[in-house]
Amino acid sequence: MMLHVPEVLTRDQVADIRTRLDATDWVDGRATVGPQGAQVKQNRQLPELSPVGRELGETILKALLVHPLFVSAALPLRTVPPLFNRYEGGEHYGLHIDGAVRSVPGTHLRLRTDLSSTLFLSDPDDYDGGELVVVDTYGTHEVKLPAGDLILYPSTSLHRVEPVTRGTRVCSFFWTQSMVRDDGQRHLLFELDQDIQKLREKLGDCPEVLSLTGHYHNLLRQWAEV
């Protein structure tokens, strides 16, 4: 399931993050990938242990955990601290797939990458090119969202970033291990949860809504790994 999650950050939060990012030092993005990724990656990133990056990442994680759409879709168990990248002057990232397991920088923890997220910190009018292109079983999808919005997609998807030919594209990106490993099961739970919320708005907590809520939690109880 691929999902647009709007307004993860407010405009003021985006502006503050961009101000701080623009004042810090960036490194060659190839330093954070293996030999295969390094052949197709051309961008800059904040160092994984950057104090500024860690602080800004905490701001993003706090916003995610109170965003009902993200929580409903991802059912997050653990999330790698958000990283930050920057593309300009023709920089790009060729077709690749994310690694199945990620280490949490500065710790001995590892997590399974079920879901990948890109949080846009530049508006579409600020740059040309730079589309995130995701290839899945349903086709090829080009993504270019307003600053503060996020795209969530399965980490099993091939994807690339098109060359940025004008301006600067700044994003945060990270991976989440879901409580529900299987994408199909997670999609079913998401749609059921969204329908329950809509029915509750119309009908309140009537017996049928309570029954559906019970079915949701029983399915989650059956499939969740915590």
Swiss-Prot record:
Its cofactor is Fe(2+); L-ascorbate. HAMAP family: Hydroxyl_YbiX (MF_00657). 2-oxoglutarate binds at R169. Fe cation binds at H96, D98, H159. Residues 78-178 form the Fe2OG dioxygenase domain. SUPFAM superfamilies: Clavaminate synthase-like. This is PKHD-type hydroxylase Mpe_A3725. Keywords: Dioxygenase, Iron, Metal-binding, Oxidoreductase, Vitamin C. GO terms for biological process: DNA damage response; intracellular iron ion homeostasis. Coiled coil: none annotated. One of its GO terms (molecular function) is L-ascorbic acid binding. Binds 1 Fe(2+) ion per subunit. InterPro entries: Oxoglu/Fe-dep_dioxygenase_dom (IPR005123), PKHD_C (IPR041097), PKHD_hydroxylase (IPR023550), Pro_4_hyd_alph (IPR006620), Pro_4_hyd_alph_FE2OG_OXY (IPR044862). The keyword Oxidoreductase applies. Gene3D superfamilies: q2cbj1_9rhob like domain (2.60.120.620), Rabenosyn, Rab binding domain (4.10.860.20). It holds the Pfam family 2OG-FeII_Oxy_3. Its EC number is 1.14.11.-.
